[in-house]
Amino acid sequence: MKFKQKGFSLIELVIVIVILGLLAATAIPRFLNVTEDAENASVDGVSGGLATAVGFVRAQWEVDGRRNTSVILDGTTVSLDTRFGFPTGTSNTDVTAMTDATCQEVFSSVLQSAPRNVLYTEDARDQRYTVRVLDGVGGSATGINGANVTNIDLCVYHQIASLVIDQNTGIATPAPDLNTAGAKGVTYNPGTGQVLSFTND
């Protein structure tokens, strides 16, 4: 009795391996970028949420008559500079006197369910964003009274996943700024209300 052999011949096996290799060579690079795409989408989402929240603060300020130094947003008092009407924290009312802490107050008070954040000089492990103010980097803007205000501060929110974190201290090294290589994040200008996402890939 003769048995008929079932299965792949050597040539068929080689062809299948070559085809699988070609598929892997084209698919793997796409899957390697999934993490970076997710990080970029996360930053864009936070940026959009912050821009919307800043717009809500400005709208409430307009409804309240444009001269109040604060508005109530969802039960939270949010301070603002009456020359512009955009949030400046919970107690600060000057766009040229922002601090790391007031930038953090803006982020945490206007966003509903704000991402976990910490000042850039603190342990960033188990956080999502670091917060930093860059003094005078926001440029100038014209207030509602027509006066030009210069040296407006800029709030910068860096995505921690894009930073190098010291394993011992948990602090981002070097201190993140707008030029930190590989960094991703969001900027907020309290003089213009402009919110932008950035990536330094």
Regions found by a protein language model. Name each.
Residues 2-42, 46-49:
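N-terminal single-pass transmembrane signal-anchor helix
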Residues 76-201:
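Intrinsically disordered, low-complexity regions enriched in Pro/Ser/Thr/Gly and acidic residues
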Residues 38-66:
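Membrane-proximal N-terminal amphipathic helix
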Residues 68, 72-76:
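Charge-dense, E/K-rich amphipathic alpha-helical interfaces
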